[in-house]
Amino acid sequence: MSSIANIRFGAPTRRNILKAAGAGAALGVLGGFAGRAFAQEKLKVAAIYTVPFEQQWVSRLHKAANTAKDRGDIDYVATENVSNTDYERVMREYAEAGNKLILGEVFGVEDAARTVAKDYPDVAFLMGSSFKPDAALPNFSTFDNYIQDASYLTGIIAGAMTRSKNIGMVGGYPIPEVNRLMNAFMAGVKEVAPDTKFQVSFIGSWFDPPKAKETAFAQIDGGADLLYAERFGVSDAAKEKSVLAIGNVIDTQADYPDTVVASALWHFEPTLDHAIAQVKAGTFKAEDYGVYSFMKEGGCSIAPLGTFEGKVPDDVKAKVAEKEKAIKDGSFTVEINDAEPKSS
């Protein structure tokens, strides 16, 4: 894994791959899905993850799938820690095994994943991706964690809680799905503390808690008294140095009751439930599922303040509630900014 291109983005031949899928694949999928409803039977769903189940991002997919399984809607199997070089093989094995919906994240194998989808037109694929779906491959839909709404609101809280007006931010890679959350958080901070300084770092990994922790230590040494924990390991550093942290995707306050002030939560259930319904109805098609992560769709929220309920100023909580209401009713829209955030 020597570069971001090899890890999160496919090779720059995506257009050629999708063009190769062509109209023939489109007809095959229409023939496979049209009129083939699965409403009266459990849907066979498989998932392929490149990281452990407990990793923040993937844990939300795994949780949503298990919730659907517990409801009796699906049969669910999953494989974790699949390398990019093995990903295509595992996709094919799950398709051959009769699974009708395959879930995963293909940021490092964009082209290969689409090739597999082309070869299995009767199988629906719902994949985390940096790219948009293409009508030439109608059985391949994409999603991402568009939780900028919740990230913005946690930024408002962070801006009120930092005393030094110096915030450290540790991310995995400077790519859209990370950048948009960081930028939304920074915008929220500036809403209440416009002069705040930001230290922004990326560790070049999706799961390296020791490296994230060391990076966070350096930011604390640089004056940060609050950390944006986009990666595991950051809150450990905050706890050891007695500074505050803002969580991302999952709520870890139970593990860090004196450290994690607030967290932006991702709820994957609306995304997955829509896909399940579409496959069962025989109407699955190429679609951008990103919108189902928006707050107004129930795709994200702020975790309860819990141990910090009495520590966050009342006027700040009121401001957050006001903005949350505006986001949900559509009168306020958080900007989606995928540009790489910079230190200030």
How does the language model describe each region?
Residues 1-32, 36-38:
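N-terminal secretory signal peptides
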Residues 40-344:
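A residue-level marker of the well-folded mature domains of exported/periplasmic proteins
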